[in-house]
Amino acid sequence: MKITSEEPEIHWTFLKVKDKVVLDFGCGIFYSQQATPDWFLKEGASKVIGVDLGNDKPNHFIYHQKPISSREDILDLVHEYKPDVIKCDIEGAEVYFSDITADDMKSVTQFAVEYHDNDLKLLMDKKIKDWGFENSDTHQLFDEDIDRIGVIYAWK
């Protein structure tokens, strides 16, 4: 599986985060480029919770250093923070959202997930509708030789 990175101002600009609580799975804290929590804060998010594996301990947003390897890992944070916005960019973690219910997602008004497989894209499209999101859009990332990688944006 190809691990990708992004420029937040290109890949996540569809998320309107001003005055919102953002739960950022795969926040990129260990990359040398800008981590997405910094960008969300610059865009006016009221609180950002970043989740990743890096060792840095930022003091300007809430950081959880933990792997996301199950539905429960996601739900623990969703229930604790009740985010308005969820962004997930963890290669392979898309599948853990498949068992999450509409009730679990009731606080979430915007959802963005990077997918790395066309079957997972179809699964996420279905889940987004099941969760009650009224609108969604898909954007392919990178170039045509990586056509199975993209982002699904959804909003209520």
Features from the language model and the residues they span:
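Short amphipathic alpha-helix with an adjacent loop that forms part of the alpha/beta core around
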Residues: 11-16, 73-81, 99-103
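Short acidic, Gly/Ser-rich segments with clustered Asp/Glu that frequently serve as metal-coordination loops
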Residues: 28-35, 56, 91-97
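Hydrophobic pocket-lining residues within nucleotide cofactor-binding pockets
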Residues: 27, 53, 66-69, 90, ...
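S-adenosyl-L-methionine
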Residues: 1-51, 54-80, 85, 117, 124-126, 131-156
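Conserved acidic-Pro-Pro-aromatic motif
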Residues: 60-62, 81-156
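Structural motif corresponding to alpha-helix initiation and N-cap regions
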Residues: 8, 34, 71-72, 95-98, ...
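Conserved phosphate-coordination/catalytic loops
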Residues: 2-5, 68-72, 92
